[in-house]
Amino acid sequence: MLIEHERGFVLHVRAWRETSLLVEVLTEQHGRVGLLARGVQGPRKQALRAALQPLQLIQFSAVQRGELAQLRQAEALDTAPRLVGDTMLAGFYISELLLRLAPRNDPVPELYACYAQARTYLASDLPLAWGLRRFERDVLDGLGFAFDLQHDSDGQPIDPAARYRLDPQEGALRVLSERLAQDRRETVTGAALLALGEDVMPDADDMPGLRRSMRGVLLHHLGGRGLKSWQMLEDLARRR
């Protein structure tokens, strides 16, 4: 199959043999595509190597043969955001999450839109944690894994003052008592869930619980195997 003039975001790149690269690209029309870029070394290939970097929006043509497509041509369509510190790790995170969750060669246009929006958000001065929670919510929605952010698992309206445990299958389970500190760590306030559903940033005190709860849901859909970027973010937080 010939893929011509397709737009996509570079999610991941690694060296293959001495002069080639294996590139994972998220596209709107073909889903996540694996590319084999041969012979990218040398001064004449400098522009191509620069284009094949994570977070970069490219236009490419390739021939699909089996699992990997043979890259014929690629060029950068813009300048990828220059991220540093926490935002750089966040960029790694959004790419790794879609590398793991986006289906190969199966288009999910909503995921392409999620990535484009998150990429723009990371380049802004807006609150980073809130941008990532919105991204996670939209990714789950795009994959058909969204849960009700207005009602709990019993169909009752979510109570802003109550706490809930997020179940990947059943949604928000109301917690009637919290006997241990660990119980509280594993729950999220109803106010935070309602805010997420209304696309309004929750109170700062509610953000850690929302992060942990969303991570638990994502971990389920990742097959129980976490992300490298999660560990990197935790290591960074411990060093501060």
Curated annotation (Swiss-Prot):
GO terms for biological process: DNA recombination; double-strand break repair. Keywords: DNA damage, DNA recombination, DNA repair. GO terms for cellular component: bacterial nucleoid. Belongs to the RecO family. HAMAP family: RecO. Involved in DNA repair and RecF pathway recombination. PANTHER family: DNA REPAIR PROTEIN RECO (PTHR33991:SF1). This is DNA repair protein RecO. It comes from Xanthomonas euvesicatoria pv. vesicatoria (strain 85-10) (Xanthomonas campestris pv. vesicatoria).
